[in-house]
Amino acid sequence: MMQLPILPQNNVTVATPGTDPMIDPETGKPRGRYAVVSLGCPKNLVDTEQMLGRLDADGYRMVDSVDGADFVVVNTCGFIDSARDESMAAIDEMLALKRDGKLRNVVVTGCLAERQQDKLLQARPDIDALVGVFGRNDIVSVVDELYSGLQEQRTIFKPAAVNPLSDAMRSAVTPRHFAYLKISEGCDRLCTFCAIPKMRGKHFSKPIEQIIDEAKRLGDSGVREVVIVAQDTTYYGMDRYGEPRLNQLLKELDKIESIDWIRLMYFYPMYIDDALIDTLASARRIVPYIDMPLQHASDKMLKRMARKTTRSLQTDIVQKLRSRIDSLVMRTTMITGFPGETEEDFVELMDFVQESRFENLGVFTYSIEEDTPAARLPNRVDPEVAARRRDDLMELQQQIAFDWNDSRVGGTEEVLIDAEMPEQDNVFIGRTRSEAPDVDGLIYVSQVDPDSPVEVGQIRPCEIVASQGYDLVAAAT
């Protein structure tokens, strides 16, 4: 899970000297200064950006620290125990500042707010407003009412949307050269361990033309890499068109000249057919990278998880993707300690990972989610056993990842430069086509030729000169 430093946007109005900084002289509306804490997945980050866009358009001014803020928006994650703990810690930190008189209001939004609703207000009565996932379009009215002197707590919880919410009105908080693009909301999968459908509702897809318009806007604003996200990317279109339409969408996205890289996240093994693989293999802008969370490899565990797949089917799809897409890099996630997992099941998982050799892999220990079928399953696994299995799996994956990075030394790869290295002259941080933002390794790039400066946002050919575990060292050519 990530907590992002949210920086002020360049297009906000700055108070004129001698005027009340809380009133916009042009609109007469209240204009408070606000800070944001954004937690959780990239899909939640897009929601954060959408709320910021609405606040900015209404005259509120974002600042880069809570020290200079009148109010704070905490956009929470409620996915697993560790995410909930992180969200509660962030809320408590902001409420402490409010009690000390350093913040006027604390607004809590997102998945934890949606999941707990009144329980959260009972536990933290100092929260001024609670906004659920589908109330985010009303963030301005919530803040306006707080500034008008409303004393009661404000809550906005709406039913899951049946039409997609537009993300066009966004204030980007990622570096300007990459952005996440959400193509759908919610999920129709009924995985027994997962509470996302309870927080995000059923799957609904944006129209293709709306996604293309949002992508073009991103490209025209200077975005070089667009990262496609959804709860279930390959299910795109089923609700709207009656059949999967990811293939058609990707063909249209691949035509956008202003975008260099398109990256695909959250693939589900179902609906990956030959036509889609052909598109992935032949596209000019879609990078050879697929994030496909598989969760397990034991048929017994997959059945108990209601994944509607088998180890054999997963092996077949991994092999087919690798054989058809040149230089494909794959990322997946696994769960250890799911109820009923035996040592034999775990050995099957280890064997599958050894066989598949995913370049990037994350592991979670099972987290009990209230009101999910898995929470009622017998044969709970001891948390220490689940943690030991996680560590064993990560030790195996570490060797696979390190071997893969070692094999890249001496080659030349294009690197998207994300940032300057703090306190080191002429050293930069970037990623190749093989690394997604926030979750994969980094490339440390040295500028060798002073007459050919490296700049943030460039896609720069670099020679890989050394491996440092999960990360690489490179020299700009």
Swiss-Prot record:
Keywords, in A-Z order: 4Fe-4S, Cytoplasm, Iron, Iron-sulfur, Metal-binding, S-adenosyl-L-methionine, Transferase
SMART domains recorded: Elp3 (SM00729)
Ranges of residues in domain Radical SAM core: 173-403
Listed cofactors: [4Fe-4S] cluster
Gene Ontology terms describing biological process: tRNA modification
SUPFAM superfamilies the record matches: Radical SAM enzymes (SSF102114)
Localisation per UniProt entry: Cytoplasm
Region annotation Disordered: where it falls in the sequence: 9-28
Entry-linked Pfam families: Radical_SAM (PF04055), TRAM_2 (PF18693), UPF0004 (PF00919)
Domain MTTase N-terminal: 32-148
Gene Ontology annotations for the cellular component aspect, listed alphabetically: cytosol
Record-listed E.C. numbers: 2.8.4.4
Keyword NAD recorded: no
HAMAP family: MTTase_RimO
Function: Catalyzes the methylthiolation of an aspartic acid residue of ribosomal protein uS12.
Protein name, entry field: Ribosomal protein uS12 methylthiotransferase RimO
Species assigned in the record: Rhodopirellula baltica (strain DSM 10527 / NCIMB 13988 / SH1)
GN (gene name): rimO
